[in-house]
């Protein structure tokens, strides 16, 4: 391992000890905000520190085995050779592990997120497919024991959704789901198709991190246009009696957010503000990313909603993930929420891409 990397790891080990000492300081314990921030930092350092301590121990074991190998006793020499082999193998494994742990982390990976699904080309069939995608994500969320809360729906005339927005809450949800952003295409025979012809339609998926209030960008109230209207769709008689639905328009960017799934106007407004903040932040982040990444390739794509990332071919039972040339003949399982077969290879490819970029620097 490079000396510069060793020095960086030694610095992290030192910082870990500092943070641990601070967490037992009465002055820090009484300051909830600082205690929370240090606890988060300690948690983030834990994996890399544990791996580096194992790396240091394996390095010591290798040196001890080398010393033993210089002994005249043939039995000791043989034992030393075996120990050297084991230590070298462990060091290689730990070096790979540490390289990945040292990769720059997306600060939003641990955040909750919003999933927005919109029907695109394909009319009624696109709306039905948007409903299928929403069900797929709901099943995946359930399998992870996360929480899903529907924030806004615009139902299709023959089923599914023209648009659906949901919030997913849980540990590391944005980091798991962020690669779902982009164009999703379906190829299948619609139920209304009498000739048995395969139709192609599409949906866009946008995954945005929820921005904590303490980190949220400040939105000038003068830049907001607020409209109230009566909620449509399910909800009983109540929806016809009060203007509980909210539409927020951010005038400088033109971003519009509607929320109507809560019965109270106050709750709908709070949720709409959360989504609006996330969208504005995403625009700012994309500007920054474009500037930073203009010189390097990103294998898993930019998450641009216009980029076609995946095709679901029902006649062949096939899912094709175009960004990493992955083809699975497990369409039914994927549509039932078994997404790890796609998400895990995407995350590994992203790590490989980042490692390649670091080695070029």
From Swiss-Prot:
One function term, GO molecular function aspect: translation release factor activity, codon specific
Region entry Disordered, spans: 285-305
Bias (Basic and acidic residues) ranges: 285-296
Mod. after translation: Methylated by PrmC. Methylation increases the termination efficiency of RF1.
Protein name: Peptide chain release factor 1
Keyword Transport: no
HAMAP family attached to this UniProt entry: Rel_fac_1 (MF_00093)
Positions of post-translational N5-methylglutamine modification: 237
Record's function text: Peptide chain release factor 1 directs the termination of translation in response to the peptide chain termination codons UAG and UAA.
Family classification: Belongs to the prokaryotic/mitochondrial release factor family.
Record Pfam families: PCRF, RF-1
PANTHER family for the chain: LD18447P
Subcellular localization: Cytoplasm
Lineage: Bacteria, Pseudomonadati, Pseudomonadota, Gammaproteobacteria, Alteromonadales
One term under GO cellular component: cytoplasm
Protein keywords: Cytoplasm, Methylation, Protein biosynthesis
């Amino acid at each position: 391992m490079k000396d510069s990397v060793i020095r960086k790891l030694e610095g992290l080990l030192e910082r870990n000890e500092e943070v641990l000492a601070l967490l037992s300081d009465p002055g820090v314990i009484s300051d909830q905000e600082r205690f929370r921030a240090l606890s988060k930092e300690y948690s983030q350092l834990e994996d890399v520190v544990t791996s580096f301590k194992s790396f240091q121990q394996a390095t010591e074991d290798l040196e001890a085995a080398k010393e033993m190998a210089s002994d005249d006793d043939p039995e000791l020499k043989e034992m030393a050779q075996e120990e050297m082999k084991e230590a070298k193998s462990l060091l290689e494994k730990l070096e790979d592990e540490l390289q990945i742990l040292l990769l720059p982390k997306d600060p939003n990976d641990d955040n909750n997120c919003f999933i927005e699904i919109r029907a695109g080309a394909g009319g009624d069939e696109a709306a039905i497919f948007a409903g299928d995608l929403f069900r797929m994500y709901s099943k995946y969320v359930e399998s992870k024991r996360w929480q899903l809360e529907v924030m806004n729906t615009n139902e299709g005339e023959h089923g599914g959704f023209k648009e659906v927005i949901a919030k997913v809450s849980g540990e590391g949800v944005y980091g798991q789901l962020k690669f779902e952003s982009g164009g999703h295409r379906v190829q299948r025979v619609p139920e209304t198709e009498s000739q048995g012809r395969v139709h192609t339609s599409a949906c866009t998926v946008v995954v945005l991190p929820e921005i904590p209030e303490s980190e949220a960008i400040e939105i000038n109230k003068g830049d907001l246009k607020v409209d109230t209207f009566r909620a449509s769709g399910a909800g009983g008689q109540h929806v016809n009696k009060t203007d509980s639905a909210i539409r927020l328009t951010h005038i400088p960017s033109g971003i519009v957010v509607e929320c109507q799934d809560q019965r109270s106007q106050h709750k709908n407004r709070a949720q709409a503000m959360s989504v609006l903040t996330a969208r504005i932040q995403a625009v700012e982040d994309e500007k920054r990313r474009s500037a930073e990444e203009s010189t390097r390739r990103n294998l898993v794509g930019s998450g641009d909603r216009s980029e076609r990332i995946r095709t679901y071919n029902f006649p062949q039972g096939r899912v094709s993930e175009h960004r990493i040339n992955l083809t699975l003949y497990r369409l039914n399982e994927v549509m039932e929420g078994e997404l790890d077969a796609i998400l895990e290879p995407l995350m590994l490819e992203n790590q490989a891409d980042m490692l390649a970029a670091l080695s070029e620097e």
